[in-house]
Structures are given as structure tokens and as C-alpha cells.
Curated annotation (Swiss-Prot):
Its EC number is 5.2.1.8. GO terms for biological process: 'de novo' cotranslational protein folding; cell division; chaperone-mediated protein folding; protein transport; protein unfolding. SUPFAM superfamilies: FKBP-like (SSF54534), Triger factor/SurA peptide-binding domain-like (SSF109998), Trigger factor ribosome-binding domain (SSF102735). This is Trigger factor. It comes from Trichodesmium erythraeum (strain IMS101). Transmembrane segments: none annotated.
Length: 485
């Protein structure tokens, strides 16, 4: 067997494989023997079927196809080992299989060509002596005050409102459905996926939903139904909705205002396991300080990698891109399902191709960032030893508790993260990162989902007591008012 390699664009190689007459004959004879042993043909015992009867019954082309399939697969595997090819994904024939079957004659020479994606050869120049800027995230005591006020608001008593229109700061209970108007005449309007709810409770605060939605509810009266026109931001998290106009039909069913508790030890005990408000503040100060330090670390890491990516030379194979897109969409589906959203609506067979195409640029960018780290680590002989991987994996397993996980995937992720951490540390020592005030540099904004209220991450890590929003009925309010007269 003779193998000739040829480099192709996009990190592919082509193999021209020449097969000897002996190999082609042996492949054909092996298939004949296999079917003689296993074929069930009336009038003959297994293993006793005459050769000519078998060929007549199965058809010579069928037997040739089976023989050629085995022959090609075996030859490709031998070629991969013989030529030390670091293949990614599956080999793809450059000639139609049917054509190869047609030309295949057992006992005669033959040749075929196949191509395959291989590990990309990445080059990074000028990765030492760089100068980049990164935002320094500093702790501000206002973060604690804002968080406590938000929790205080949640623990407020809801008092029904009658006799006035909705105002900012109220709590509204509404039914709504969002419709994307048709762009062409005769086309039906499209209902917004996940943009429909009944008896949905919301705080009338700016920034909770897409611009225009909350503002449209302000001024509505009880039991009023109104159409509110809005537009999804151009950088909306769901790309298929970004920039599109939307009309919400909203019915205001109930309106309430909050009577807030005092910010004292009693409140601290209600919203956490801390006995005093001072202890809770101390915990929050430490937590937010740590978060800001971690954010600064992430900003520095991003700035370094962004700079190095500009010096990266690489052709990324299609197989890697498709795999990355698949992983990203799978993660998105998992995240959406945690909010109770039916992912089948988002990832239908009609929408999936478009979502894959929209995800592709980000997937390529992520791959470039990974390749930059891997390339520098290889150039500078930065490695992770087995003990480090084992220790970090055990930490992650403890955090996962009893959740199911893929141990091989876990090891891969842990190894990549440790290698990245070591490489970033090395790069910091061999370059300069200038810290600038937070908000100085451009950062990507995050737009909330239609029915999604994003909570502060620190909230889930505070030792919790009970969480209760006391709701007072209208008749109870009347009783209280009468007793005060």
C-alpha cells in the first residue's frame, strides 16, 4: 500500500492511497468467506452455500461494495498510523463510493483519495513584551447597600392599590403576549418564543424588561388592556429576535405597593442565617470584595488573550468549529431549561440551522483563544502535572455533589483550565497589564430575557433563612383602615 499526502487549506490533508492486486483480492475473498459462513439460503446449510449461488443470490455489486467498504476503512486506518496523521473527525472520500464500486475489480490495482481535518498548526509571534489595558474592578460599599435594599424590597408587604394608575415602583400582576409583526403583506405575525405569561408578577422598575415594556405599563388602570410597542435591542441575547419590533398585548390585573421592613437584625435573620445586620454586612463586604478581585483577574486575562489573538496565524478545521458550535448550543439549552423555558421551541429543526450559523463566529473566536493559550504553553514548555489535575478534579467533584458528570470531560476541562491559568501567569510576568478604572474600556452589555429576572449571583451563596413576601388582601386593608378611624 502506497500513501501520498497533500496539504489542503483549512487544516485538511488529502491522502492518495494505492492498493495492490493482492490486497484487493484478499478483501473480496474475505467477504465471500464471511457470507458463506453466515448466509441463510433455502436448501443449503450454513457454511455450505456454493460460491456461485451466494454471488447470484446477493449480487456481485453488493459483495464488491461490502469488500470495498472494509478495504477502504482498513487502508485509511493503516495510513493514519503509518503517516502519524493527527486526524480530527472522519475521513471523507473525494470520489463517490458508487464510482469506486463500479471500477473495483478484485485482483487488480486500484487507488482512491480521501481527505480529513487534522489538528491545526497555530503560530503566535510577539507574545512577549506586550502592553495592554484592563479594567480594575474595585469594591464599593454601595454594592452592599444596594443588595440589602433589594432584599428588603423582596421582604416587603404587598398592599393592594385601588383608585389610581400604575406608577414606577409598584408591583403589577399582568397577562401578556408578545407578537412580532409581519414584515411583508399577507404574512402572519409571529408569537415571541417565551414571550407569553399569565398572572405574571413584576416590579415596575427600569431595566427589568426590554426598553418600552415597563414604561408602557406605567399609567395603565386596573383591568385595562393595552398594546405596547417596543423593540428588541440590537445586541439582544437571542440573536433571532435582535433588533426586531414587538407588540405586547398587556392586561393589568392587579396593582400593589410594597411596605418595607426596617433594615435591622430582624431582617438579617429573615433573609440569612446571620443573627445581626452587622454580621451580614461583613459577609457581603468580603463576598463582593472577592468578586471584584476575581473580575479584575478575568479582565486582565481577557485583555492578554485578546492581544495575542491578533498575532495568531491559524486555519481552524471545520470539524473543530462544528463541535464547538454544538457544545455552545447544548450549554445554551441547559441554561434555558433551568429557567423553565421549553428548549424545543428554541431549538426546533426549522430554527437550528440559523442558530448554528449565528453561533459560528463566536465559536471560531473561542477556538482561537484556546489555541493561543495552547500554542504559547507548548512554545514555553508549560505543563500541568498529574497531581495538580487530580487535586483540582476532586475540588470540582465536591462542588458538583451528586450531579451526573462525564469524568473524561471533567479531566479535559480541568486540565485546560489549569494550563490556561499557568500560561496567563507566565504571560503576565513577561508582559505589562495596565489597570484602568472600571467603565473606562468598552464592555459587552447583557440584555435580560423577555420573562427573565436575573438575580445577583452572590444571593445564592448567602446562608439562607426563609424568604417570604407577605401579601395583604384588600379586605384586610379595609379592616385595618376602619380600626384606625
Amino acid at each position: 500500500m502506497k500513501v501520498t499526502q497533500e496539504k489542503l487549506p483549512a487544516s485538511q490533508i488529502s491522502l492518495e492511497i494505492e492498493i495492490s492486486p493482492e490486497m484487493s483480492k484478499n478483501a473480496y475473498e474475505q467477504i465471500i468467506k464471511k457470507y458463506i459462513r453466515s448466509a441463510n439460503i433455502p436448501g443449503f446449510r450454513k457454511g455450505k452455500v456454493p460460491r456461485n449461488i451466494l454471488i447470484q443470490r446477493l449480487g456481485k455489486n453488493y459483495i464488491k461494495a461490502m469488500a470495498l467498504d472494509d478495504l477502504i476503512n482498513n487502508c485509511l486506518e493503516k495510513a493514519r498510523e503509518q503517516e502519524s496523521i493527527k486526524a480530527i473527525g472522519q475521513f471523507e472520500l473525494k470520489t463517490e463510493f458508487e464510482e469506486l464500486v463500479k471500477d473495483f475489480e478484485p485482483g487488480k490495482e486500484m487507488a482512491f483519495s480521501a481527505k480529513v481535518d487534522v489538528e491545526p498548526e497555530a503560530k503566535v509571534e510577539d507574545y512577549k513584551g506586550f502592553l495592554v489595558q484592563a479594567e480594575e474592578a474595585k469594591y464599593d460599599s454601595a454594592l452592599v447597600d444596594e443588595f440589602l435594599e433589594e432584599r428588603r424590597s423582596r421582604m416587603g408587604t404587598l398592599i393592594p392599590i385601588e383608585g389610581r394608575a400604575a406608577e414606577m415602583g409598584d408591583v403589577a400582576i399582568v397577562d401578556f403576549v408578545g407578537i412580532i409583526p409581519s414584515e411583508t403583506e399577507g404574512e402572519e405575525a409571529q408569537e415571541v418564543p417565551g414571550g407569553k405569561a399569565q398572572d405574571f408578577q413584576m416590579d415596575l422598575k427600569e431595566g427589568q424588561f426590554i426598553p418600552g415594556f415597563i414604561e408602557g405599563i406605567v399609567g395603565m388602570k386596573l383591568q385595562e388592556t393595552k398594546e405596547i410597542s417596543a423593540q428588541f435591542p440590537s445586541e439582544y441575547s437571542e440573536a433571532n429576535l435582535a433588533g426586531k419590533p414587538v407588540v405586547f398585548t398587556v392586561t393589568l390585573k392587579e396593582l400593589k405597593e410594597k411596605e418595607l421592613p426596617e433594615l435591622d437584625d430582624d431582617l438579617a435573620q429573615e433573609i440569612s442565617e446571620f443573627e445581626t445586620i452587622d454580621k451580614l454586612r461583613e459577609f457581603l463586604e468580603q463576598k463582593f470584595t472577592k468578586e471584584k478581585e476575581e473580575k479584575t483577574k478575568q479582565n486582565k486575562e481577557k485583555a492578554i488573550i485578546d492581544e495575542l489573538v491578533t498575532h495568531l496565524e491559524v486555519e481552524i478545521p471545520e470539524t473543530l468549529i462544528k463541535n464547538e458550535v454544538q457544545q455552545m448550543l447544548a450549554q445554551s439549552a441547559m441554561d434555558l431549561s433551568q429557567y423553565g423555558i421549553d428548549v424545543k421551541e428554541f431549538f426546533s429543526s426549522e430554527k437550528l440551522p440559523e442558530m448554528q450559523e449565528r453561533t459560528r463566529p463566536e465559536a471560531i473566536e473561542r477556538l482561537k483563544r484556546d489555541l493561543v493559550i495552547a500554542t504559547v504553553a507548548k512554545r514555553e514548555s508549560i505543563t500541568v502535572d498529574e497531581e495538580e489535575i487530580k487535586a483540582e478534579s476532586q475540588k470540582v467533584v465536591k462542588q458538583l455533589k451528586e450531579k451526573d458528570f462525564d469524568s473524561d470531560r471533567l479531566r479535559q476541562v480541568v486540565t485546560q483550565e489549569l494550563l490556561k491559568e499557568k500560561t496567563i501567569k507566565w504571560l503576565e510576568a513577561n508582559g505589562t497589564v495596565e489597570l484602568v478604572p472600571e467603565g473606562t474600556l468598552h464592555t459587552e452589555s447583557q440584555t435580560p430575557q423577555t420573562t427573565e429576572i436575573l438575580e445577583t449571583e452572590v444571593e445564592s451563596e448567602i446562608p439562607q433563612a426563609s424568604e417570604t413576601i407577605v401579601e395583604v388582601k384588600a379586605e384586610e386593608v379595609a379592616t385595618v383602615e376602619n380600626s384606625q378611624e
